[in-house]
Amino acid sequence: ISIDSSGEGLYGNFFNIGLGGSKQDGKIAPERNITTQWDGPWIGETAVTDGGWSAEMFIPWSALSMPEGSQERRIAIAMFRKVAYLDERYSFPPLPFSQARFISAFEPVRIDKVNPRQQWEVYPYVSATSDEIRNEADGRGGIDVAWRPSTNLQLTATVNPDFGSIESDDVVVNLTAYETFYPEKRLFFLEGNEVFVTSPRSNPRGPSGPGGSGGRQSVQTYRMEPTTLLNTRRIGGSAKHVEIPDYLTVSGVEQSKPTELVGAVKAVGQSGGLRYGLLTAFEKEVEWRGVWNNTDREMTLKSDGRDFGVVRLLYESAGGGGRQSIGYMGTLASNPLNDAVV
């Protein structure tokens, strides 16, 4: 099932469940721009009956981004069923892949008295690490906070975040001249990230990217992509701005280490047809272990971390049987050597 919670074909979510209980969810941007990194709080169960099968889903309204409304609210839905052994796909309303319209063609539905309450979410953590080779131990703690004062505004913040539990990336064999963009898997950056994506208004088949089965994937035939101004994987990534003195040797392993964050703040919301987003993040001081070339004595090379800032404004209108949109995005990446403003 797919739900256009805006009611105007501006944004939505999809929820899939298989007969064996497997689940998948994600977000939808106009028209058929689908991302699967989002992980929503919902429940689904299936069962085989004497006459066939059944499926039930419980999707809380608070999991969806919804514009501020009155007692009666307009949304749109679409339902899909895939019969694997026949390789057939059914949908209501009919939404063939050859059709440019997708989310704006969902079936309108009116609902009453749906106005999710404001929400608080707090995730503290404590972790410890031990390095037996260097005979070192380290402990740390931090907190993630999310606040949704209304259905059309969400504020999230993280202090000393712990991204060590994030699953690793798949191995991608890229023999092209184009950079591989790995998907974002950190929850803080996933929530509301669709606002920061500059996407085409009509995308019948979906974007290109790594394909194939198993852990080793190959890059498919290159197709023109939207302008990418924000790649959040570079926030907290390996430091590229550190200058290494000639008398010092730093291993490639040290240089490829991710940089820890001091904290980050993000605000995402909407007012009518205007959607907006603000993201800022601050990295900790970079510390690399190096070796003096002449003495083989170890030393620590230090450098200030980077600061990041992003502002996004997007106005969309689906009135008059057409779609109009105009947007702005500004980015800042600041480090001790230079500042990049786009």
What are these regions (language model features)?
Residues 1-317, 327, 337-339:
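Structural preference for beta-rich elements and adjacent junctions enriched in aromatics
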Residues 322-326:
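Long, ordered, helix-rich scaffold segments
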Residues 330:
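Cysteine-dependent hydrolase recognition
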